[in-house]
Amino acid sequence: MKVLSLIFVIFSVLVLFASAKDPVCDQPKAVGRCFAAFPKFYYNSSSGQCQAFIYGGCGGNENNFNTLEECNAKCA
């Protein structure tokens, strides 16, 4: 019985760590302070989805991905 309980605890911890998102994903969308128009993707933590936005080209934050696939792999 103790072994079964230990296995359950280990499994629970592994699931918890595997489902933890990168802190980058909690950053807000930041279009940057310049005036270029690069199509990018960011993770919207309110909707739980990656969404497109236009990046100005400088500034911003790390919640800024070149492709939808890259955003989903990191955050979704």
Curated annotation (Swiss-Prot):
Q: Which GO terms describe its molecular function?
A: serine-type endopeptidase inhibitor activity; toxin activity
Tissue specificity note: Expressed in salivary glands.
Q: Which UniProt keywords apply?
A: Blood coagulation cascade inhibiting toxin, Disulfide bond, Hemostasis impairing toxin, Protease inhibitor, Secreted, Serine protease inhibitor, Signal, Toxin
The chain positions of domain BPTI/Kunitz inhibitor read: 25-75
- Do you know which SMART domains this protein is assigned to? KU
- SUPFAM superfamilies (UniProt xref): BPTI-like (SSF57362)
Q: Where in the cell is it found?
A: Secreted
Which Gene3D superfamilies does the entry mention? Pancreatic trypsin inhibitor Kunitz domain (4.10.410.10)
Query: Between which residues do disulfide bridges form?
Result: C25-C75, C34-C58, C50-C71
**Pfam family name, one:** Kunitz_BPTI
| One Gene Ontology cellular component annotation held by this UniProt entry | extracellular space
Location, primary (coarse class): secreted
Signal peptide feature range: 1-20
Q: List the PANTHER family.
A: KUNITZ-TYPE PROTEASE INHIBITOR-RELATED, SERINE PEPTIDASE INHIBITOR, KUNITZ TYPE, 3
**Function noted in UniProt:** Potent anticoagulant protein that inhibits the hydrolytic activities of all serine proteases tested (trypsin, thrombin, elastase, and chymotrypsin), with the highest efficacy on thrombin.
Q: What is this protein called?
A: Tabkunin 2
- The source organism is Tabanus yao (Horsefly)
